């Protein structure tokens, strides 16, 4: 191993080996004085080790050391983190010529000749006699660099006198370094004024008639160029492109320059694209920059057929047209506007966009023109691609001085560079080293100046050119506007690796891994560039921008204190020469340049890993023995690992070559050619550095010992024959596979899988007839069951001779056909003799005809064929007639016959040709003359325009034709035209096969397959009667990495779609429609049969997140195989099997996977056009997936915009693309571990979630400000009195003083036990002012629960009213009655309160049976209030109703937010709340209220004329509430958990078209949706997941419950950082347990779906189902299983308890009848619950079931339980009601009905039904009678129902109150009516 000090001769090598010396002052270093010689040697050795570590780029340094016994070689391992005193010197043998070292430390003896740099200590142990010097040879160090190295030694020795710090913290910059570096980097310069295109405009005035552009396709003067660009810019302005990015895809031409200038003049930014790049890469760039238009030169428009992107072709014709319009608008961009967006290679596999602004480019180009000595006589040969930033310097730099830019054609540029330079008489050119090497000075006599950049320059090229012209080396990156260093005027002996000096401000060199540390002059470090020409940053990538464009490090203060300009980290390694010029040393980490193109090695490695299927890949640029830079991929060779001492590089074997060959195919489609490795090197092992990173330097060194040819030959294709099949049959199958898949025979062996080699279901179908011709009889099912070649052949042999698969007999007997002909003829409008045959329809045909009847024009495919001029049209018509005669399916009509159903009739008739003037006329004709029962289903027309070629039009109904048939039909026409015989085909054979399938077998299959299915329809229908009308479409192209898979594209697409549906519906049991080709049926010739064999099936996929991708695909493929015999059963038959099958067939998404069907381009007719139109489909969403190859799939979505919005579909396609790539690349990954969040999702999430700042204010202080601002304004208007703001402030302050004197300290919790009263806001404010936090208690709660709350709080006192004095005495020993408050008591000094102090606690249901208290701080609540007050229109004029129970946190927002906004709190009494709400609201003149939907349902808008604003919250609402209220008030909806300051989201306006599930956008917080089972994983946009709330409104946690707090208030997930680069990450987020999804509006608003866990809300009150279950299990000790859930029979929300005593495992889950014994038992259980739980937490329904159902993941299937009750009527669920003991004063009804009801009783029954079912009174549905002896609660009523009934009944003259409803029988209520 060698470790040599580098040659630092400043680029001027000399042969001088004489020793020179520099003396160092030893007096500064105490460790070198008064110590022993051995100690001095140790210090010098350590110092020298650190020096070599800094200069040699090596962490294991070696050097010579002289001791008393002579010279030896020593080694020291140096690391950044090791403290210098811990460095250890180890012996490493005798010093000699072969030691590989050239430096040393000596004691003054003889210096060996091999040492070129030595640190010498002369003298004895005495101070005065010691001296220190550094001796060097001039051939190693120049005098300047020697002084720099000596200064570094002094700095290190100085550091060693101090503390024992890590080596990495030693400052190695001596004073000389600081002074020199300061001289190298001067102060910054001002940015030039004006915009980039102003350069050209200035030349128009000065040199208007001089040539600006001289191109292969024309010349333009400056004036002409400006005129054309101005005209085009006006058109671009009219398109609204100002301020946007406009891609330009163009070859070099005058029009490309015109386009660039026009884009700039239009106020837009130009983004050049390379036409030769893969289309997918181009589309990605266009999408990333959000372009609305793309400019192209002729020939490239077809590359950008993208929705929403206009393509503008820049050509003379287009400019002439633009000139005619007269538009000449121009927009002047601002100084900071973007001018160009340039694309570079990105580490993630996607290109990254660099935004260059006008000032930066102008600065760079002005300096470039000056340094390049441009003049008006300069003729610049513009060589580089427009995507290369230097091209901008060439173009605009030349034009800035009035010169001429010469643009060659692509052919000239690449094939005859010398000739092109001569022809254009070019005087200047910027070239890469590779391009310059191909030229000789004698070939280009006019060339005066050459600038070279982009890659290293060879010495021989410098020698050849430096004496013939001005040769300059340039350096720069896209981020520095193309260049920043220039080394002009090279001599023939110049060092070409010297990049020059910074001509614009500064270039700094820092430690390669730490920009905060400068390195000494001469040491290698990373180049940092500072100056006005830096880019703005990376487009849409703040994280990468922050990483590369950094603020000034601390060391900048040593040179320019107060400097604020940014620095760019280049990732290039360089070193200073002693004159300040910079020498290139290599690339840092993953960046490199090859042939002048900057590439990201990490990106290439990513693609190569995917293509090769291995992680062990290193890609680097190798400089070969013959001095050629080769992009090389190093990979582990397959097979057993080799010994560590064996050769590193191996010769490739066949396995390695095969991997490389396959990989190259994939790389060609995913990477530009410049980024594809040209050499693949097999390794025996992957060498690692000491830090366990790939040892790239070792790989480059070893590979660099080879020539370019030797490298390329390592993996050259030299395949040995694959394992030969053993039998003749296997050889036949091998040949068939080879023909079918286009593979060489040698690549197919007996163990190969059909699907692994690229086969799919389509190829399997084609294989069957090919094999039959060779005597191998197999079916498509055989291929799926036995995919390996050897297994498949063996199966064929084992199966023996094939069974009959030819179905020739008509499925309808001949005598029956004759009997049916008259009726068939009548329906078809023909003679009976014209009917050839009649036989049944397949289920597909029946279904398609039925759907067509619902929507005219549906399922009609119109195809157009261009007829070449040489074709005889009459002869073509006859050929079509011949084919139609031979194919009865094209003469088939469908009829419906009485008693026997749909049949198809073959009619003997010729083609009826239509002659039309346009295709639209033909389509319209087929719509008006619909393809219905009895009509022709195949129609032909000719379109023969005068000037264009004739076209043949064919319209055919899908009931007789499918896409598979299209190319088959064309082939038959081709044969007929050529005079060849056309074979007869009969579709009845396929029909006979379908009819022969036993229906009962298929029904049993589907019954089993769909058992217990509980899918969710997606997308949702607006209503049950709605018929989807898909009128819109979107499409995208999926490009996959090349992957060899055993699974078909169909299986992979089905899995991905199932995964997305599961996410978007929140259901792991997924069903969607899937279309099968039907060509797997065992029918002879089915692969060539022309006719509709398609089948649509309900495909059920049960997602198991623990399964791997491969296992899930295997399961899907096996299911598909099992389904094949039953796929023709038809949806209309499957739906009748049972309710579960019916639900499964109600899907609204259909997935179609088909092979590419571009149509054969036949000689007879041109390309077929059969654009898929949305009207072909009848589902809300249809996905058509065209598999165009193993790695390309065209996705097209057809959708109904009323069911799913376009933005949502775009999200789905993006996610499906992302999912396909992952399923393709990581087959071993668990489904749960797949990341389905697409790049588009991340972009939207970043937009929707921005940081919120907390409001640093206390709540009572905000209210006090209102007291100062409007002291006499009414703050409280209550039934028991009114308070102004001044009075409220004064009373609360006095009460606060009393609380403080009674021991309420800062942070104490004070319960408030009050009825609704004006004293409640007084008490709330008083507690806050006293420094405490209030807790509102509901006096209706059980005493046991209230005691539990007070005990948890350790409350020092309870504030109570006189009414609740006794109850309060049971809660605390110390009471304070508000009625006894001393109004004359003096005001005392109160403690300070901080925004971070608690303001209140609110208790919610707890899963352990104990309520849990949520603590909210002042700042949290204040932030939320400020965020929602304005959008909710809560103003000082608002009079807000205080309606909510004190147990509901909405009561807090009713009080506090209102008062903070300066409004008035309108308080009603408890009696008014339940009995006379309308009157109370009117009396208080309330204008604003927060209510739950349950309450609103009981109210009539007309009863509340004063209300102007209504916000619904607390529970889910329905459309009815919106429809009833949106026309009367400003309707809103809010959402928020108690843990997040009451309100977290707000939808500020609800209209009749609003989605009732929409809870709006976040307020005072950010809302993230995460995986429902793992909050560390983001959920894809649009999918259902758990809502996480982040931001200042998040509460402190649960009082005294660390476990529950940590579970719900968790640390912010790591992924939040990617959305907040450079920002502080929030400490915690709150897991709400609510399932939500983003609205399809894609505006960041949320849809509420359900609770994730067992926590729900009922009538606005939050409860934990597990708490109810806990108490119920305690009371029902005999029950083995209990589930409590919220159910909605008839739309009415109730709490139900399901239980089972004897589990019936084999029985379906169903409700059992309630027995008398069970009722008696439950009547004893209910009182036990009522004693422990609030009334809203006690179940109403008690339902015994056969068993508790489980989901596929073995969790309780709550959805299944809810469905048991969902359709029950009140009469049906009445037996399951167990009455409350508080309502038991009346005897329970025995079900006896009065024979005759009074008029009042009939009216009351109708009102009760309306309340219980939500029906309108006019509904005609009969309802069972209700016994007048019943209690309202016994038939499903509750307190809210009582309120609703009271409101309705009052309008009908009844006088009872809500309390009467709960306590009286229905008969007694009926008698309470005014006559």
Swiss-Prot record:
Q: What does the comment on domains in this protein's record state?
A: NRP synthetases are composed of discrete domains (adenylation (A), thiolation (T) or peptidyl carrier protein (PCP) and condensation (C) domains) which when grouped together are referred to as a single module. Each module is responsible for the recognition (via the A domain) and incorporation of a single amino acid into the growing peptide product. Thus, an NRP synthetase is generally composed of one or more modules and can terminate in a thioesterase domain (TE) that releases the newly synthesized peptide from the enzyme.
Q: Mind naming one GO cellular-component term on file for this protein?
A: cytoplasm
The record's Gene Ontology biological-process terms are: amino acid activation for nonribosomal peptide biosynthetic process; ochratoxin A biosynthetic process
Name listed for the protein in its UniProt record: Nonribosomal peptide synthetase otaB
**Keyword Glycoprotein included in the entry's annotation:** no
Q: Under which main EC class is this enzyme filed?
A: ligase
Query: Which family is annotated?
Result: Belongs to the NRP synthetase family.
**Positions modified as O-(pantetheine 4'-phosphoryl)serine?**
761
Sorted alphabetically, which CDD domains does this protein's record hold?
Answer: A_NRPS_SidN3_like, FUM14_C_NRPS-like
Biotech uses? Stilbenes such as resveratrol, piceatannol and pterostilbene affect the expression of the OTA cluster to reduce ochratoxin A and B production and thus could be used as naturally safe and efficient compounds in food active packaging or preservatives against ochratoxin A in food. Pterostilbene with methoxy groups demonstrated greater inhibitory and antitoxic activity than resveratrol and piceatannol.
PANTHER family named among the record's database cross-references: FATTY ACID SYNTHASE, NONRIBOSOMAL PEPTIDE SYNTHETASE
Q: What is its EC number?
A: 6.3.2.-
Role this protein plays = Nonribosomal peptide synthetase; part of the gene cluster that mediates the biosynthesis of ochratoxin A (OTA), a mycotoxin composed of a chlorinated type I polyketide dihydroisocoumarin moiety linked to L-phenylalanine, and demonstrated to have nephrotoxic, immunotoxic, genotoxic, neurotoxic, and teratogenic properties. OtaB is responsible for the linking of phenylalanine to the dihydroisocoumarin ring.
One GO MF term on file is:
non-ribosomal peptide synthetase activity
Repeat found in the keyword field: yes
- Outline the extent of the Carrier domain: 724-800
Show the stretches that span the lipid bilayer. Answer: none
Q: Where is this region: Condensation?
A: 836-1245
Q: Where is this region: Adenylation 2?
A: 1264-1659
Organism listed in the record:
Aspergillus carbonarius (strain ITEM 5010)
Q: Which UniProt keywords apply?
A: Ligase, Phosphopantetheine, Phosphoprotein, Repeat, Virulence
